[in-house]
């Protein structure tokens, strides 16, 4: 049966890819992905047939994978982070209903919530949720409801897609929503370019986060009531009693 791997490539550097992901890419004849992600693979896979599509051509990218697989080639579709977390794994299964004799296999990767948390310290050490601020596929009113529910439930929150060229004020809007239920001195932080050249992080308060300059390669963390700043790192208490 024809084979397609749906590969989570992690945040960027090869060192942060799982061995399973590298093995899948090495076993593939064709690697398909968003232009930026293919460039991140570097020289290691240049002997493969590399096919790219620009942003917002996700459906075309998925169909391309199936067409190549039906030519008898083993295909990998690469997604940043984990393919099943804001990636293309679900879309591949949906589109796959149109094609026969193609086996799909999802290869997990390190998502930005995990890799970004490691840079910041230990902000996800208790219950947490992830929320994307992109309204391309989810209406803003639903995003707002999720922000409110997360704040009221005292979850640590990892925000994906906090800004873009067309959504420059979305993080500010999200902070304004959270500030209705959370005090402005709540410990927060954000990481830019996780696992790539120029990785940097900032620890701040929710009030300060409101005016932070972020982009689409930034992941934002809002702490819960038990989150504190220790030696410049963002740490959420698990609940152990320390004497």
Residue ranges with predicted function:
Residues 85-153:
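Class I SAM-dependent methyltransferase SAM-binding "motif I" and its flanking Rossmann-like core
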Residues 73-79, 123-133, 207-216:
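A polyampholytic, Gly/Pro-enriched intrinsically disordered region
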Residues 4-6, 152-243:
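A contiguous loop/helix-start segment that scaffolds small-molecule binding in enzyme catalytic cores
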Residues 1-104, 115:
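Class I S-adenosyl-L-methionine
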Residues 10-16, 137-140, 201-204:
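Short gly/ser/thr-rich secondary-structure transition/capping motifs
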């Amino acid at each position: 049966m024809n084979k397609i791997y749906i590969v989570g490539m992690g945040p960027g550097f090869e060192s942060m890819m799982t061995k399973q992901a590298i093995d899948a890419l090495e076993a593939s004849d064709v690697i398909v992905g968003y232009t930026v992600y293919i460039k991140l693979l570097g020289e290691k896979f240049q002997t493969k047939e590399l096919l790219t599509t620009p942003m917002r051509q996700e459906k075309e990218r998925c169909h391309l994978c199936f067409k190549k697989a039906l030519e008898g080639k083993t295909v990998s579709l690469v997604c940043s982070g984990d393919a099943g977390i804001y990636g293309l794994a679900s879309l591949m299964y949906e589109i796959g209903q149109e094609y026969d004799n193609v086996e799909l296999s999802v290869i997990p990767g390190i998502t930005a919530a995990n890799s970004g948390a490691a840079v910041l310290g230990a902000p996800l050490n208790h219950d947490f949720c992830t929320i994307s601020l992109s309204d391309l596929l989810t209406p803003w009113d639903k995003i707002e409801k999720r922000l409110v529910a997360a704040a009221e439930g005292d979850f640590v929150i990892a925000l994906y897609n906090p800004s873009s060229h067309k959504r420059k004020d979305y993080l500010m809007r999200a902070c304004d929503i959270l500030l209705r239920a959370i005090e402005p001195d709540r410990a927060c932080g954000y990481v830019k370019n996780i696992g790539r050249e120029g990785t940097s992080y900032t620890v701040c308060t929710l009030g300060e986060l409101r005016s932070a300059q972020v982009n689409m390669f930034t992941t934002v963390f809002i702490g819960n009531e038990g989150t504190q700043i220790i030696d410049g790192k963002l740490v959420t208490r698990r609940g152990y009693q320390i004497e």
